[in-house]
């Protein structure tokens, strides 16, 4: 993880797309993630990666799936803005599924960017809600005074530097497919 890039004010800080993924596709990703097995999610800090339950207490599974990654990018690309004079080039190879059960959350933070050896770097966070919850679990953006409610198949793309949090799930289980959009 790197430093935080400034927000590109010429582009929307947040894009929401309903029905981005079908309920059947969402269910398949959840089944595959459960079969892979979840672990406690860690956080990448400047001095290293560690589990920090005071900041984050959800579970995560990380995997690579080239066909899923390609499908996600092809669906997203027409909706993605140029940022800092660069264009979208693809998604991170490492896909993550997050699972939030009642009481689990991720406190307010910014997503760090990653730079590849080819010079491309991540600038946007990609999140697809794979499930809905009965209560809680919103993704909260304090600077926008806006919360996004989990809805099966809803995609959210936002600039890495946009402050956000996953509010605690109260009832139900929230699953999110997470990646990063690389730019060149």
Predicted regions and their residues:
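Fe(II)/2-oxoglutarate oxygenase catalytic core
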Residues: 1-125, 129-155, 161-184
């Amino acid at each position: 993880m790197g430093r935080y890039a400034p927000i590109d004010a010429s582009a929307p800080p947040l894009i929401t797309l309903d029905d981005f993924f079908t309920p059947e596709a969402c269910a398949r990703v959840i089944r595959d993630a459960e079969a892979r097995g979840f672990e406690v999610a860690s956080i990448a800090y400047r001095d290293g990666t560690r589990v920090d339950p005071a900041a984050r207490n959800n579970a995560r599974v990380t995997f690579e799936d080239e066909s899923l990654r390609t499908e996600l990018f092809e669906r997203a690309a027409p909706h993605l803005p140029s940022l800092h004079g660069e264009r979208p080039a693809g998604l991170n190879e490492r896909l993550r599924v997050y699972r939030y059960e009642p009481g689990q959350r991720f406190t307010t933070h910014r997503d760090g960017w990653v730079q590849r050896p080819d010079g491309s770097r991540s600038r946007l966070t990609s999140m697809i809600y794979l499930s809905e919850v009965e209560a809680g679990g919103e993704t909260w953006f304090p600077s926008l005074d806006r919360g996004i409610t989990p809805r099966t198949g809803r995609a959210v793309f936002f600039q890495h530097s946009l402050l956000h949090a996953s509010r605690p799930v109260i009832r139900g289980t929230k699953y999110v497919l997470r990646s990063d959009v690389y730019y060149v």
